[in-house]
UniProtKB/Swiss-Prot annotation:
PANTHER family linked: NUCLEOID-ASSOCIATED PROTEIN YBAB (PTHR33449:SF1)
Keyword terms, alphabetized: Cytoplasm, DNA-binding
Pfam families in alphabetical order: YbaB_DNA_bd
Name of this protein: Nucleoid-associated protein BA_0020/GBAA_0020/BAS0022
HAMAP family per UniProt: DNA_YbaB_EbfC (MF_00274)
Family statement drawn from the similarity comment of this UniProt entry: Belongs to the YbaB/EbfC family.
GO molecular function ontology, one term from the record: DNA binding
InterPro entries per the UniProt record, alphabetical: YbaB-like_sf, YbaB/EbfC
Function: Binds to DNA and alters its conformation. May be involved in regulation of gene expression, nucleoid organization and DNA protection.
Compartments (UniProt record): Cytoplasm, Nucleoid
Subunit and interaction comment: Homodimer.
């Protein structure tokens, strides 16, 4: 009886180690994937990676109005939030396969 139990425990440990390696690889890949958030009909574009790091902000020249800087700020904010939301979705879909069925609190993955 004991021997079978230890074998199961060893198998479980091997599976957990394999899953840890796969999760680490998935985390690394998230940093390489990008998402794009936009606002103002594409006048502002924000590019972020799967780690929610902003990589680039693009502003089309015609949206820059020195008389209305507030609108430009609002558009940059909206595009940034859009990019971060998409980065969250990417992270959840990528990492969620590892936590499916674990019933983690607070919507973690």
């Amino acid at each position: 009886m004991m021997r079978g139990g230890m074998g199961n425990m060893n198998n479980m440990m091997k599976q957990m180690q394999k899953m840890q390696k796969e999760m680490a690889k998935a985390q690394e890949e998230l940093g390489e994937k990008t998402v794009e958030g936009t606002a103002g009909g594409g006048m502002i574009t924000v590019i972020a990676n799967g780690h929610k790091q902003i990589l680039e902000v693009k502003v089309k020249e015609e949206v820059v109005d020195p008389e209305d800087i507030e609108m430009l700020q609002d558009l940059v904010l909206a595009a940034t939030n859009d990019a971060l939301k998409k980065a969250d979705e990417l992270s959840n879909s990528t990492m969620g396969k590892f936590t499916k069925g674990l019933n983690l609190p607070g919507g973690m993955f």
